């Protein structure tokens, strides 16, 4: 007597049985319509032909035909009449557990081939807070228009960023890096210089803006700014015999700007950052009385993603946004 379909043992491959014989015993995958799996998912969920048909946008007769095809393909009734409607056979109960993961895998596989505008995906960008203030207002509108299902996550901490790029924990880094290490690639986004920000009615603005006046002020710094910036300032002041205390360090550019608006402190930031925060809080922007080297902001990524179409598209969008972030 034949065993029920759901109790048949797994057919292992034994010595002496040819590959051709094994293939004759297996279902022909080429003959399987993947749309039937979507119908099966709805039938198993609703256990009602009409409701399942409505869920997938089919007519009731079309869903009935799909159920008939599924029964023939799986050699099982799947749904049988019970006292309170249709009930699942043991095989159908098993498929209820298996099918969601199978369909999820198929959907994810198909999603990989979609254009950016159709894909649902996430990108993690590491960049200092003050660079995010410059870049994101130009980048996010582009991405929302061209890839509406793309989620952007930013991380202001650059420590260990190269290792995270290699591991795939983050996708790109935006920051100051003169040359990309071996295994990484670099694309210049824009150049910038440093400038000073003070409150609009700061007493120093009514006097000659000298290096002595600059050195006498309390300085505010952003934690994510490069240490070399303060090294430049400190070295120049030291050479001139001027003393300057350590700056008050805060975590974000917004906090720094609010402090500048409320105190007699001074903030040294990239010119693009200064322009944006000054417009928000009515601050004054003036050149520093000490010469500070300009710098470049670059996009860094790992070679593992270099040829990936979606990653290449993202890099192009970041570069295009940066070109308008003047």
UniProtKB/Swiss-Prot annotation:
Q: Name one GO molecular function term.
A: DNA binding
Q: What else is known?
A: Has two translation start codons in proximity to each other leading to a protein of 326 or 301 AA.
Q: Which residues form the HTH lysR-type domain?
A: 32-89
Query: What does this protein do, in the record's words?
Result: Acts in trans to stimulate nod gene expression via nodD3 and exo gene expression via SyrA.
Alphabetized InterPro entries for the sequence: LysR-type_TF, LysR_subst-bd, SyrM_PBP2, Tscrpt_reg_HTH_LysR, WH-like_DNA-bd_sf, WH_DNA-bd_sf
The family classification in the record reads:
Belongs to the LysR transcriptional regulatory family.
Keywords of the record = Activator, DNA-binding, Nodulation, Plasmid, Transcription, Transcription regulation
The record's DNA-binding region positions are 49-68
What is the protein name given in its UniProt record?
A: HTH-type transcriptional regulator SyrM
Q: Name one Pfam family in it.
A: HTH_1
- Tell me which species this is from: Rhizobium meliloti (strain 1021) (Ensifer meliloti)
Is the keyword Iron in the record? no
């Amino acid at each position: 007597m034949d065993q029920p379909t759901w109790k048949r043992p797994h057919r292992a491959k034994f010595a002496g049985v040819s590959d051709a014989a094994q293939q004759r015993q297996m279902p022909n995958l080429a003959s399987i319509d993947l749309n039937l799996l979507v119908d099966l998912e709805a039938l198993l969920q609703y256990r009602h032909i009409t409701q399942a048909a409505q869920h997938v946008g089919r007519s009731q007769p079309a869903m009935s035909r799909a159920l008939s095809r599924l029964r023939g393909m799986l050699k099982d009734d799947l749904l049988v009449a019970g006292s309170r409607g249709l009930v699942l056979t043991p095989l159908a109960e098993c498929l209820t557990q298996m099918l969601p993961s199978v369909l999820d895998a198929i959907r994810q596989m198909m999603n990989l081939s979609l254009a950016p505008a159709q894909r649902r995906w996430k990108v993690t960008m590491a960049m200092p807070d003050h660079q995010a203030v410059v870049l994101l207002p130009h980048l996010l509108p582009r991405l929302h228009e061209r890839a509406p299902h793309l989620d952007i996550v930013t991380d202001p901490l650059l420590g260990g960023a190269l290792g995270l790029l290699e591991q795939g924990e983050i996708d790109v880094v935006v920051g100051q890096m003169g040359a990309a290490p071996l295994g990484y690639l670099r694309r210049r986004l824009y150049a910038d210089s440093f400038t000073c920000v003070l409150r609009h009615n700061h007493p120093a603005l009514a006097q000659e803006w000298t290096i002595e006046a600059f050195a006498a002020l309390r300085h505010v710094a952003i934690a994510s700014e490069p240490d070399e910036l303060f090294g430049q300032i400190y070295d120049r002041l030291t050479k001139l015999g001027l003393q300057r205390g350590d700056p008050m360090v805060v975590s974000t550019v917004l906090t720094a700007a609010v402090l500048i608006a409320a105190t007699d402190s001074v903030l040294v930031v990239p010119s693009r950052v200064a322009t944006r925060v000054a417009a928000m809080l009515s601050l004054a922007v003036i050149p520093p009385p000490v010469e500070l080297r300009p710098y470049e902001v670059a996009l860094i990524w790992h070679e593992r993603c270099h040829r990936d179409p979606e990653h290449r598209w993202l890099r192009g969008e970041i570069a295009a946004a940066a070109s308008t972030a003047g």
